[in-house]
Amino acid sequence: MKRICSIYKSPRKNEMYLYVLKADGLERVPEGLLPFFGTPVHAFDLVLSPERKLAREDITKVLENLESQGYHLQMPPLEDEYIEHLPEELLRRNDPV
């Protein structure tokens, strides 16, 4: 099953995205979500199918959410996922002996 999807980015949270079916637009997005998300900014349109790979989302879950609730919300990554941790020896370099 292929779906044409519009993807919107949040002006409030970096790396937060809202996926909706292009034909529906934002009609099925709950009103309570928009104050949290902010005014959606259209990023791009995409054809989704079960074979397609997404960088940070499970395509099966995205397609299920689009069918069942009319949208999919992609949350920003957790801090641990994008912060590079320094080796212990570098962290202690300036410690007093």
Swiss-Prot record:
This is YcgL domain-containing protein Pput_1298. It comes from the Bacteria. Gene3D superfamilies: YcgL domain. Coiled coil: none annotated. InterPro entries: YcgL-like_sf (IPR038068), YcgL_dom (IPR027354). PROSITE patterns: YCGL. Residues 3-87 form the YcgL domain. It holds the Pfam family YcgL.
